[in-house]
Amino acid sequence: MFTGIVEEKGKVRYIQLTGESGILAVKARKVLEGTRIGDSIAVNGVCLTVTSIQPDGFTADVMAETIRRSSLGSCKAGSQVNLERAMAADGRFGGHIVSGHIDGTGVIRSMLREENAIWVSIETSPQILHLIVEKGSVCIDGISLTVARVDEAGFQVSVIPHTGEETTLLEKMPGDLVNLENDLIGKYVEKLLGIRKNEEEKKESGITMEFLEEFGF
């Protein structure tokens, strides 16, 4: 589990794609502290397993599903990435619950300055957008941010100077892809409400869990 508080900006050494999967090598320092092979590091919000460690970096396998759902496939040598180690059991919880299993990507629509903050507007799919709520949490490229506004096609967040300096978000341009993970609690609530709705529909039809168990299902 992660918190969405980026520990450092790393730099992609290379990404080797073989078919739909590959190997990602990242130059880093801070996230190597205490890290062992098999540990998890979030790279732009994507949970990856460390497969080898060097004095100034690490490598990780990137699966086909990760390439399909994320923007990691578009990384190249020199690309800056946000890095965070999985949270220790006694670690400080600074952001929100982040699984590192992203839901998809969004496209930056615009970036506008207002005094000391930057408004970042992101367009995304209806499947992701319907779980994004104003004043709720969203993880963008591994960064825990608060949703300020939601519209029919996307949403906006306000990025403070510290977040801009410590992450890669403000280095991006309109049209660039970002990885998105919806609030995990919201996803569980939606799932439970869906189950309850299905149960109510089954009761109306006379088919309940008790009915199915009674007849051996």
Specify the residue positions occupied by each region the protein language model found.
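Conserved loop->alpha-helix
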Residues: 1-217
